[in-house]
Amino acid sequence: MALQATTTTFCFSGPTFRSTPHSLTSKRPISIKATTSSPSRLSNSRSNLKGRALSSDGSTQESPYVVCFGEMLIDFVPTTSGLSLADAPAFKKAPGGAPANVAVGIARLGGSSAFIGKVGEDEFGYMLANILKDNNVNNDGMRFDPGARTALAFVTLTNEGEREFMFYRNPSADMLLEESELDFDLIKKAKIFHYGSISLITEPCKSAHISAAKAAKEAGVILSYDPNLRLPLWPSADNAREEILSIWETADIIKISEEEIVFLTKGEDPYDDNVVRKLFHPKLKLLLVTEGPEGCRYYTKDFSGRVHGLKVDVVDTTGAGDAFVAGILSQLANDLSLLQDEERLREALMFANACGALTVKVRGAIPALPTKEAVHEALLKAVV
């Protein structure tokens, strides 16, 4: 058993979660800190459930959907790194939210994706829905809440581009998605259904999440899980650990960070393969451990290994893990046989690592997500 867009500058004159990459050979300590829209505002044209993805020459081709479920919000990113939120002279607003980032990342790489979630019936909510549409993401599964605002997150950047977050929620619209609002047709016809853990924090979204994943599983859809731990959003660390692990054994693909291994195993060594293997449940097809600039580790029932990352100048690490997920899911959606072929899986993970590396060179998450052409160019230039 396993262990249970365009940016605009705004001027403004808690508890945090810090993410820092680590190398296996350099074992530095790891710390964990603690309704439907108006038709006039959005296009309601419905995409085919087997999407029309853009190819490199601008033509369209059919591609299986990756449906992403969860939160979409506004990140406010400081224009100057190395300052506290109180001292930051200005912020740029950028669309974000891990599942939405993955959906846009897949579409930008030429795949087909859809997003299911809830935003406020406010200017930010309409902006986010239109950003999805503008990035060729099916937004038919989006819902709008007239009584709650779109979630906001203020991001503090260190001089090295690492992040701390302050969230404005409680409640925000993403927490209020109800099971009755789900687009089950979209869910059941997906190739991959991807989600995080933030949608498990409160009702009614928790029940909607569980129902959506259950429907996908029963329809034979591959389930992809990135816990994306944001500890300040949870009532307690114990509650976060319990809920994150409560759906662990239903997932087919899981991506975690070194920090999340430490958290989920209550302090065990994330560099020890025996520790990581405790998180590999019997029905899991692929477990991925991201290591920032060092790359990633991969584990299947039959093989495991590491794929080195690309070294780049870091501006902002926001969205890097989501870009990595988009990179690997875009490959798997078209060919699940990669899971049985180590050589080809390694090539797909090199592609995913490059997606993450390119994202940290630009501020914000969605604005930084790369195209397939940019990824291939970076790989060609990389020194092995």
From Swiss-Prot:
Pathway participation: Glycan biosynthesis; starch biosynthesis
GO CC field: chloroplast; chloroplast stroma
Keyword Iron: no
Subcellular location: Plastid, Chloroplast
Amino acid composition bias (Low complexity), ranges on this chain: 35-48
Classification via CDD domains: bac_FRK
Record EC number: 2.7.1.4
Transit peptide limits: 1-46
Keyword entries, A-Z: ATP-binding, Carbohydrate metabolism, Chloroplast, Kinase, Nucleotide-binding, Plastid, Transferase, Transit peptide
GO biological process: carbohydrate biosynthetic process; fatty acid biosynthetic process; fructose metabolic process; starch biosynthetic process
Stored InterPro entries: Carboh/pur_kinase_PfkB_CS, PfkB_Carbo_kinase, PfkB_dom, Ribo/fructo_kinase, Ribokinase-like
Catalysis performed (reactions): D-fructose + ATP = D-fructose 6-phosphate + ADP + H(+)
Region feature (Disordered): 34-61
GO molecular function annotations of the record: ATP binding; fructokinase activity
Described function: May play an important role in maintaining the flux of carbon towards starch formation.
Family statement drawn from the similarity comment of this UniProt entry: Belongs to the carbohydrate kinase PfkB family.
Entry protein name: Probable fructokinase-6, chloroplastic
Organism: Arabidopsis thaliana (Mouse-ear cress)
